[in-house]
Amino acid sequence: MLIIPAIDLKDGACVRLRQGRMEDSTVFSDDPVAMAAKWVDGGCRRLHLVDLNGAFEGQPVNGDVVTAIARRYPNLPIQIGGGIRSLETIEHYVKAGVSYVIIGTKAVKEPEFVAEACRAFPGKVIVGLDAKDGFVATDGWAEVSSVQVIDLAKRFEADGVSAIVYTDIAKDGMMQGCNIPFTAALAAATRIPVIASGGIHNLGDIQALLNAKAPGIIGAITGRAIYEGTLDVAEAQALCDREQR
């Protein structure tokens, strides 16, 4: 299981939100490239970037920052989400050196777009499913749909999706532990690898994820915990490596 540091981009800065609210953000750095360097130096093996402005506007806004990070670390897998709603945007990021693009809102509203993207960019597409009470949320979490997470995840199995990033909105940024039962249930219900996101606070939460013994969970995204110092990236990754030998 990979420990994946999150770099959320808002107006060119590295921030963290609470429960997806743009008005409730904390700026952790005005130099996201330097922040990426910190996590890489700390031993991370993948980075999770989110263009928060892009998620709300429906098109890339902080793309220059994403490109700068990807070019600085050409051998590091980087995944980017937020505002990815066209093949042109995916092509732009892939050409910039990004390993994976995360399709969120568009995957819910137009599931057929995921299949199209997977055909055009095989191995590059991740679906981001953000949920509240088991139902998928869209548009930067501003809207909650009537679509259930597990039902939608199963729909993408035949498309060639590389992974699903599952985020429980109620947990995100709150550092109260992630929704392990549902994350494990999702991993068990689909053949697509799952990356857990939202709520990780400390090493105990990583251990709890490992204890779930869900082989389909391949990663855990962490944000506020590593910025506020309650979780150390290297220590957490070492725990995962030991447990999964």
Swiss-Prot record:
A Gene Ontology molecular function term of the record: 1-(5-phosphoribosyl)-5-[(5-phosphoribosylamino)methylideneamino]imidazole-4-carboxamide isomerase activity
Localisation per UniProt entry: Cytoplasm
Pathway terms, separated by semicolons: Amino-acid biosynthesis; L-histidine biosynthesis; L-histidine from 5-phospho-alpha-D-ribose 1-diphosphate: step 4/9
Catalytic reaction annotation: 1-(5-phospho-beta-D-ribosyl)-5-[(5-phospho-beta-D-ribosylamino)methylideneamino]imidazole-4-carboxamide = 5-[(5-phospho-1-deoxy-D-ribulos-1-ylimino)methylamino]-1-(5-phospho-beta-D-ribosyl)imidazole-4-carboxamide
Keyword hit for Isomerase: yes
Entry-linked InterPro entries: Aldolase_TIM (IPR013785), His_biosynth (IPR006062), HisA_bact_arch (IPR006063), Isoase_HisA-like (IPR044524), Isoase_HisA-like_bact (IPR023016), RibuloseP-bd_barrel (IPR011060)
Class in the EC hierarchy, top level: isomerase
GO cellular component term of the entry, any: cytoplasm
Catalytic residues of the enzyme: D8 (proton acceptor), D130 (proton donor)
Family: Belongs to the HisA/HisF family.
PANTHER family assigned: 1-(5-PHOSPHORIBOSYL)-5-[(5-PHOSPHORIBOSYLAMINO)METHYLIDENEAMINO] IMIDAZOLE-4-CARBOXAMIDE ISOMERASE
Name of the protein: 1-(5-phosphoribosyl)-5-[(5-phosphoribosylamino)methylideneamino] imidazole-4-carboxamide isomerase
Source taxonomy: Bacteria, Pseudomonadati, Pseudomonadota, Gammaproteobacteria, Pseudomonadales
